[in-house]
C-alpha cells in the first residue's frame, strides 16, 4: 500500500500500478477500501508490505507514531508481521523524492524475525505495535545513537 500521489511520479507509476494498492490518504472511505483489498490479497496468499507510520517521517531516522490499521489487519487475518528496518533510505530518498530522483547509494535493510499474531485479538494491537516498533528501532538506535540519545 502506498499513497496515491505516487501514481503521478513517472518513474514509479508503472511499477506502483502493478505492485501496490494506492491510498488517497485524505479519504477515510478510500483507506477502508485499500485495507479491504489488502485483506483480500492476504486471503489469496499474496504477501503485502505496509509502512505502519503511513508516511515518511520528517525527522528520520527517528520513527513516527505507528497507525493501528496494519496491526488490525494482521490480527484479523492471523498472519505474522515481518518487521523490516530501512537503515538509510532517509539519506537516499529526499522528502520530496516525488519531485526529483533520490541519491545514489546502497539501501541497507534488516529483515527481522516474524512476529506471530495467531491467537491475538484487537485488544492486543498496542502490544503488537510496541513489539514491532522495538524490533525496527533497535538497529536504528545502534546505527544512529546521536538521534536516539535524548529518548
Regions found by a protein language model. Name each.
Residues 1-28:
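Catalytic core of membrane glycerolipid acyltransferases/transacylases, capturing the structured
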Residues 33-151:
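Non-catalytic C-terminal accessory region of glycerolipid acyltransferases
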Amino acid at each position: 500500500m502506498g499513497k496515491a500521489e505516487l501514481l503521478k511520479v513517472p518513474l514509479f507509476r508503472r511499477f506502483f500500478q502493478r505492485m501496490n494498492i494506492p491510498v488517497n490518504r485524505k479519504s477515510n472511505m478510500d483507506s477502508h477500501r485499500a485495507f479491504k483489498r489488502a485483506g483480500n490479497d492476504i486471503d489469496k496468499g499474496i504477501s503485502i508490505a505496509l509502512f505502519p507510520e503511513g508516511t515518511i517521517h520528517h525527522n528520520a531516522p527517528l520513527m513516527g507514531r505507528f497507525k493501528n490499521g496494519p496491526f488490525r489487519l494482521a490480527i484479523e487475518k492471523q498472519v505474522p508481521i515481518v518487521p523490516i528496518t530501512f537503515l538509510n533510505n532517509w539519506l537516499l530518498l529526499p522528502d520530496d523524492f516525488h519531485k526529483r530522483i533520490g541519491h545514489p547509494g546502497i539501501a541497507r535493510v534488516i529483515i527481522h524475525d516474524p512476529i506471530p499474531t495467531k491467537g491475538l485479538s484487537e485488544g492486543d494491537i498496542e502490544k503488537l505495535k510496541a513489539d514491532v516498533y522495538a524490533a525496527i528501532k533497535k538497529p536504528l538506535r545502534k546505527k544512529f545513537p546521536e538521534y536516539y540519545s535524548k529518548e
